[in-house]
Structures are given as C-alpha cells and as structure tokens.
C-alpha cells in the first residue's frame, strides 16, 4: 500500500465556477506558469507517485455548483490515475479543501470524525490557555483536518488524519512591534492546533488502532 500527500498550490484556480477544467495558455495562480502547464505538471507528478491513496492538500474549493469530489475524479480520469475515487472531509471557507484520492480496488476511505471530552471534533472549538494567563482561549481550524478510516483490500483498518496547519503572516500589522505580537499569537495558535491533533492521535493509539498523520 503506497500512501502519499501532495500540496497542489492553487489547484482551485485550474477549474472555473462550474467545475470545468481550465486547460489553456492563460496564467495560472502560480507565478509565470500557464494553467495548461500546471495542469499537466500536476498530472505527471501524480502518475509518477502512483499511489494507492493520496491526500490532496489545497484541493479545489467545494461550493454550490462545484464538487471537490467530482473535480478530483475528473482530474484522475484525465491522467489515468489508479487513485481514481475521491473523498472529502469537512469543507471550509479558504478555497483550499482537504481530500483523498484512492484506488477503489485496493482500499476504501470514508470520513469518520471523532470526538473526546478534552479534544472535540476538528470542526468544533478547542479550549486551551495559550498565553499562560489562567484564561482559556477558543481555538478553531480554518481548515479542519480530515479524519478518515482507510480500509485495505485485506481488511486492515488504519485511521488517517490529513492536516494543513499554517502560522499566518502578521497581516494588518502597522509596526514591527505589532507584527511581532501578531506573529507570536499566530505561532501559539498553530501550536494549540498541533496539540489538538496530538490529543486525537493519543486517543486513537490508546484504542489500539493504527494511525497515520499526513499533510502540511
């Protein structure tokens, strides 16, 4: 079983508002790269990886009139990928989804969100004291991790957590001091998100299950 992860920068920009591929000589959202060149380059990489299961980070945006699953499966069909079926976790508002492509004759994947008293579902809110002031701070994911159950063709089950954590740039800062404060706050938030995932990992391992965390 070959499992991979691939962050496809601005994959969303390779499809129009009706989910049709944009394979032309206009510029992609990548610097100095046409949409056709990016489309074919990503396809060549995925064919070379030849994975049974691929976590696609920054998968095309899922919204009214556009299905992430349909767009990924159309892409997989275009390049004859073995990982030809797609599964989507929680959607988000960033235009960058987390999704899996998988080989249906080798495995199956389904979204199975988990929860625990101290570590809620990833689309919920995690309470933690970030700045050691004895006051809990609410933490959310802009891109909730994708918790999935991978079932191999031989019946083996593995829990997958696909994640995309970011420590955002200090947008809106008006001075170096303000930029420093915002950067520190963002780093603390990223650390809290990592602790949230770590808590889920421990929960799964304590149950005796196998687990893989992958992504950015």
Stretches with model-predicted labels:
Residues 1-33, 39, 43, 103-215:
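Active-site regions of metal-assisted phosphoester/phosphodiester hydrolases
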Residues 1-98, 173:
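N-terminal, active-site-proximal structural segment of metallo-dependent hydrolase catalytic domains
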């Amino acid at each position: 079983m070959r499992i991979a992860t691939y962050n496809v920068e601005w994959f969303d920009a390779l499809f129009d508002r009706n989910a049709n591929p944009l394979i032309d000589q206009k510029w992609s959202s990548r610097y100095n790269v046409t949409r056709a060149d990016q489309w074919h380059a990503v396809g060549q990489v995925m064919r070379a990886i030849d994975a049974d299961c691929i976590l696609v980070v920054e998968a095309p945006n899922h919204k009214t009139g556009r299905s992430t699953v349909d767009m990924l499966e159309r892409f997989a069909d275009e390049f004859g990928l073995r990982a030809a079926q797609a599964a989507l976790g929680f959607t988000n508002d960033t235009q960058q989804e987390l999704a899996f492509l998988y080989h249906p004759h080798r495995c199956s994947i389904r979204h199975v969100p988990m929860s625990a008293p101290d570590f809620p579902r990833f689309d919920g809110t995690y309470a933690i004291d970030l700045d050691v002031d004895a006051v809990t701070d609410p933490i959310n994911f802009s891109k909730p991790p994708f918790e999935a159950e991978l079932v191999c063709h031989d019946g083996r089950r593995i829990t997958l957590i696909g994640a995309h954590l970011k420590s955002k740039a200090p947008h809106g800062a008006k001075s170096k001091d303000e930029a420093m404060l915002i950067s520190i706050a963002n780093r603390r938030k990223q650390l809290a998100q990592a602790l949230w995932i770590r808590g889920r990992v421990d929960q799964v391992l304590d149950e005796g299950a196998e687990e893989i965390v992958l992504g950015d």
